[in-house]
Amino acid sequence: MAKVLIINGSPRVNGNTSIAVREMENVFQENGVEVKTVQIGNKDIRGCIACGHCYETGKCAFDDVVNELAAEFEEADGLVVASPVYYASANATLIACLDRLFYSTHFDKRMKVGASVVCARRGGCSATFDELNKYFTISNMPDSGIWQ
């Protein structure tokens, strides 16, 4: 059975981003895909400090949800990252998480499919999609494309 990890970067547990994530969960489950969703937008996640600990040990020096996500990410066949748009950018907590998650994990990501979900009142979606999809591109992960 295929597995997908969804990282919800919204600080609002029942906001618009969560509604979009729940819709994706339903579609995945209807198609026999195992889904694990983690809400990180309301967590205290530090940014990378470039200490090199992950290069030496394979895990981040900060023992928080990022190290837990690393194991889930390695097991998953796909990764969905979801975020509200703040000033044409993803939530800063999500970016800190993704910076550390992608930098500290050394497994091959080339066959893991990536997808981004963004929610905005007005503009900024294109810039935020670009910001999030670069994690997939840099890791040679195929992305699911942009659906609006």
Where are these regions (language model features)?
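N-terminal beta-loop-helix "entrance" segment that forms/cooperates
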Residues: T37-C60
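N-terminal beta1-alpha1 ligand-phosphate binding loop
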Residues: A2-N31
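Cofactor-binding loop segments of dinucleotide-utilizing enzymes, especially the Rossmann-like FAD-
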Residues: G9, I40, V118-R121
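Mobile beta-alpha loop/short-helix "lid" or hinge segments that flank ligand
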Residues: Q39-R46, T137-Q148
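Helix-loop-strand module that forms the ligand-binding subsite of alpha/beta enzymes
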Residues: A61-G145
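A generic structural motif
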Residues: E30-K36, M141-P142
